[in-house]
């Protein structure tokens, strides 16, 4: 009986060790810099600077072969845009005195394939890339003129962008990132590029002047993380 229990304990330890080598959990957080721009029929609206957001995530790396791994998880991301557009009647116009700001909070699932290289016993470098899938938990738009105190606010998923067509809650895109590990702590830098127009879902019922309104998420981020 003692030999049997000893054998089972040894097997469990070996299994746990193998699982730990194949499956790693990590958490990371940091700022997101959105350089997305509203476009109208392919023409970019005058930017008002980079919008700063955040990302916080919990991820899992699964070892495939030596150095090669797959990674996925969940992250909360704040993205959006800042520009000088405003709606004059049914026409989208640009004025340096106007400020239009869109803020969208996403729950995002990345699916990456990466390669991790050990430089020393405690220093590792990794590169990864792959698609992401995101759903918006909420979004707002504030638009107005700097010369007045009148600011209009919209829930873009209930009232729409500029109070017109409802925004698209879903986004799909492609991302890439690099990570430098110092023991269990790592720093990361990466970028995500959205494929979908998140500004509107069905432009058929709105004014011809802004049927071509488009917003695709484009972000760069940095962060610090901890690998368990």
Predicted regions mapped to residue ranges:
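Outer-membrane beta-barrel channels and translocator barrels
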Residues: 20, 65, 118-122, 182-185
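Extracellular/periplasm-exposed beta-strand and loop segments of Gram-negative cell-envelope proteins
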Residues: 35-51, 78-107, 134-173, 195-221
């Amino acid at each position: 009986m003692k030999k049997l229990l000893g054998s089972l304990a040894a097997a469990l330890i070996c299994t746990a060790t193998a699982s730990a080598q194949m499956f790693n959990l990590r958490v990371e957080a940091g700022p997101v810099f959105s350089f997305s721009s509203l476009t109208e029929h392919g023409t970019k609206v005058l930017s008002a600077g980079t919008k700063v957001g955040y990302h916080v995530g919990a991820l899992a790396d699964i070892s495939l072969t030596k150095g090669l791994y797959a990674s996925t998880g969940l992250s909360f991301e704040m993205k959006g845009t800042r520009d000088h557009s405003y709606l004059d009647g049914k026409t989208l116009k640009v004025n340096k005195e106007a400020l239009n700001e869109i803020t969208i909070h996403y729950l995002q699932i990345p699916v990456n394939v990466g390669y991790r290289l050990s430089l020393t016993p405690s220093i590792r470098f990794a590169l990864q890339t792959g698609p992401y899938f995101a759903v918006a938990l909420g979004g707002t738009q504030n638009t107005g003129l700097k010369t007045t105190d009148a600011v209009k606010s919209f829930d873009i998923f209930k009232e729409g962008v500029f109070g017109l067509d409802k925004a698209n809650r879903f986004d799909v895109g492609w991302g890439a990132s690099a990570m430098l590990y110092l023991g269990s702590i790592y720093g990361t830098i990466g970028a995500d590029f959205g494929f979908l127009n998140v500004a509107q879902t069905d432009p058929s019922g709105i004014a011809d002047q802004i049927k071509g309104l488009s917003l695709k998420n484009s972000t760069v981020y940095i962060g610090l993380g901890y690998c368990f």
